[in-house]
Amino acid sequence: MNELIKHKLELLPDSPGCYLHKDKEGTIIYVGKAKNLKKRVRSYFRGSHDTKTELLVSEIVDFEYIVTESDTEALLLEINLIQKNMPKYNIKLKDDKSYPFLKITNESFPRLVITRYIKKNDGLYFGPYPDSYTANEVKKLLDRIFPFKKCKNPINKVCFYYHLGQCCAHTICHTDKAYWDRLIDDVKHFLNGKDDKIIEDLRSKMLAASEEMAFERAAEYRDLISGIATMRTKQRVMSKDLQDRDIFGYYVDKGWMCVQVFFVRQGKLIQRDVNLFPYYNDAEEDFLTYMGQFYQDKQHFIPKEVFIPEAIDEELVAAIVPTKIIKPKRGEKKQLVALATKNARVSLQQKFDLLEKDIKKTSGAIDNLGHLLGINKPVRIEAFDNSNIQGTSPVAAMVVFVDGKPSKKDYRKFKVKTVVGPDDYASMREVLFRRYSRVKKEGLQAPNLIIVDGGVGQVNVAKDVIEKQLGLTIPVAGLQKNDKHQTHDLLFGNPLEVVPLPRRSEEFFLLHRIQDEVHRFAVTFHRQVRRKNSFSSTLDHISGLGPKRKQLLLRHFKTITAIASATSEEIQALGIPKTVVEAIQQQITDNKNDRSSP
């Protein structure tokens, strides 16, 4: 804890409000709310915490706070601050959490469409449906039963669907409002499970078609009836009152929370939503934050009722969710919340079981790898790869795996400084010497195994640097790719030889992952350097364009092509004088002409 934090902790009020933790860059990494700011914020810097909270606290170098009039106001503010700043340690709802709805548009000639977004007063919405496939299947069925307009043809034309009896052309379909009201009512009844009348009507048409010997038409009606029956069986009835409601349950264990939401429409369970995340405050408070984000996202339909667990404050939920909030006390409704809670517990336990299996697999892979190579268990592995195009902008990268998992805070990038032209061996020699001379000089943690991306030549260079130049005793292995650029052979030993490695073994998958990761990291860094070098060389020697303005252009436009496409006004908006903008545009034009000249 630094002096700034110590001083600020003394000034905290005993009031409700929100606090914002910041890292060394000034970035907001966590937003929380508290009934008592002094007690809550001080708790982060006193006593012991679990591992994930320790990690959060280790990054805090400053904090701010905002005092509110009430706990409810603090909750609303917290939700807004999280959505605005997207702190990395706060609950994040998945990006793909929107569900499809069926919508009847409020156009003069209504259409039936699928959408994932709800707009107020923009039509009638039905759903949500669990996925696009289900929504499309229901829509196909409705299209065959109800002749909504399906095209955007001009008023004097009909479309293909009109000839199938599935589209109502502008000039032919009924234009009176009563017709459309009846059609929309029929769809509403159908989607709300009141489809007996529609089935009876279809059955009458099927029998009539059979009597007229129109067997193909009769078969179509039969298929429609079958489709309705299938849709009925896919929905589980959870409640007899046919009400639309969302049912929430949650469970916490080992610093993690799982929230389950059952979407019930017309008494039928149509989908559930599962979200697991670490929590840092009281479970009830983090659950409230989750609910606030869940419904503030416009992709979620707000039902007539929301059921919540016993421990949650109804008034606080009512402040953030504009619908009827119910905390069931007994009977079927309480059992529904209990069912959601039970499912949350099962999902969370499943996560822990999978994590435990993954840990056992990874640990086994490291043990087996050490046994195969005849070395101590390689808990820490450092892997290297070069990247360049015909020797231009040569770079290298190092990735670190600890206990079989990437330790990204230990990753390193290297710009090759002493090598001219495409010489991978010399580049590897320089980078390894720089890395491990520093490890030796500064007493940094050394790896249990070094892996280089390459064959015999690369491994021999690495061993020469490590053993002969630096006098270190760190095992060195090589990962060699085949002609399809896939991990193929593990090279190790003295003399070097291929280590037999079963392709389906956990240790092979671990090495494959390490090689892919170091290659990705090196190539990504090389692209960044190449782009920056290209950017800088084009803008060199322009009067009035110094390093800061170049950096500003690079951050905003990313590429020279983007600058070339920008207007003078767009570039000047960055605070660059008009005369300099004109010089930039002239330089880009001259370079383009030079490249196109024979």
UniProtKB/Swiss-Prot annotation:
This protein's UniProt keywords: Cytoplasm, DNA damage, DNA excision, DNA repair, Excision nuclease, SOS response
Annotated family: Belongs to the UvrC family.
GIY-YIG domain segment(s): 14-91
GO biological process, one term: SOS response
Protein localization: Cytoplasm
PROSITE patterns (alphabetical): GIY_YIG (PS50164), UVR (PS50151), UVRC (PS50165)
A Pfam family of this chain: HHH_5
Alphabetical list of InterPro entries matching this protein: GIY-YIG_endonuc (IPR000305), GIY-YIG_endonuc_sf (IPR035901), GIY-YIG_UvrC_Cho (IPR047296), RuvA_2-like (IPR010994), UVR_dom (IPR001943), UVR_dom_sf (IPR036876), UvrABC_protein_C (IPR050066), UvrC (IPR004791)
PANTHER family for the chain: UVRABC SYSTEM PROTEIN C, UVRC/OXIDOREDUCTASE
Cellular compartments per GO CC: cytoplasm; excinuclease repair complex
Main subcellular localisation: cytoplasm
Cytoplasm among keywords: yes
Superkingdom per UniProt: Bacteria
Name of the protein in its database record: UvrABC system protein C
Biological function: The UvrABC repair system catalyzes the recognition and processing of DNA lesions. UvrC both incises the 5' and 3' sides of the lesion. The N-terminal half is responsible for the 3' incision and the C-terminal half is responsible for the 5' incision.
HAMAP family: UvrC
Domain UVR: 196-231
Subunit structure: Interacts with UvrB in an incision complex.
Gene Ontology molecular function terms on file: DNA binding; excinuclease ABC activity
